[in-house]
């Protein structure tokens, strides 16, 4: 189930069989859908649903389509989730190193009684059991994943970086230095947290930096932010976010495209491209 001809050519080069979604759905015992969330419903109805029968398994790596009912599977089909906690490039990299990303599994429907075994087998084949696998429900994974993306990892972090960059440059500081301080160095801090936790990170940075964390952090992100996060979680759990996103996607995603265009013109991206070019190796 590929996005482009280029993707198909890559699969052929890597000696995978390439076929239409409908043909794959007809032949496969396990149908693992890895398309964008907003496309699942239409592809399922047109090309997968007609080929489902008892004993087959539907699999996903994010529960959006099942939790928000863009896919409503028949009762005689197993439905599972196998979700690596990392992008595909990272999953492949650590697999080739002989380890694996951690992951999640979920059983949404289990008429065969074997759905959990299949989910664990797929997780093992992807190397996830070497990294550690947690069992959850599709709803838990979907709500928490959307919450983390919107409030911390993407929405929260990106806006925090942009505001920091804008504050320094508007005060007359060189944009290159502002980029280093507010964007580039974020990876260094996140890597420390990733490898040892927040307390370990604090033990590595300077006492001045740690004191500044406690001194100014609560002023920049006061307790009111947590209340706004609670409202965000309610919008996710109620289905409002999913409804708004699916309606946006059905119109061709004009607002999303406009935001992408605006971000591409933001000084933080223009300066960032120049900074990153300094680290390119010829």
Predicted regions and their residues:
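Single conserved hydrophobic/aromatic residue that forms the stacking wall/gate
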Residues: 1-7, 12
């Amino acid at each position: 189930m590929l996005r482009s001809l280029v993707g198909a050519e890559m699969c052929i080069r890597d000696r995978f069989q390439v076929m239409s979604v409908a043909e794959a759905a007809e032949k496969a015992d396990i149908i693992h859908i890895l398309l964008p969330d907003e496309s699942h419903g239409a592809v399922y109805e047109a090309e997968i649903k007609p080929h489902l029968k008892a004993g087959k398994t539907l699999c996903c790596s994010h529960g959006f389509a099942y939790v928000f009912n863009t896919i409503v599977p028949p009762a005689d089909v197993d439905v599972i989730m196998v979700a690596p906690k990392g992008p595909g490039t990272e999953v492949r990299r650590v697999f080739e190193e002989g380890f694996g990303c951690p992951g999640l599994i979920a059983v949404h429907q289990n008429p065969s009684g074997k759905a959990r075994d299949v989910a664990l087998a797929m997780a093992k084949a992807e190397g996830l059991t070497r990294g550690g696998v947690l069992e959850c429900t599709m709803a838990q994974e979907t709500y928490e994943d959307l919450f983390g993306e919107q409030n911390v990892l993407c929405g929260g972090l990106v806006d925090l970086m942009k505001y920091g960059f804008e504050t320094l440059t508007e005060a007359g500081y060189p944009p290159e230095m502002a980029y280093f301080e507010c964007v580039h160095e974020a990876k260094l801090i996140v890597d420390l947290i990733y490898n040892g936790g927040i307390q370990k990170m604090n033990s590595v940075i300077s006492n001045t930096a740690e004191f500044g964390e406690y001194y100014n952090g609560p002023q920049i992100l006061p307790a009111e932010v947590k209340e706004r996060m609670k409202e965000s979680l309610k919008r996710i759990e109620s289905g409002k976010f999913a409804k708004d996103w699916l309606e946006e996607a059905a119109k061709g995603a004009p607002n999303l495209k406009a935001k992408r265009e605006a971000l591409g013109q933001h000084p933080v991206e223009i300066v960032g491209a120049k900074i990153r070019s300094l680290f390119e190796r010829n």
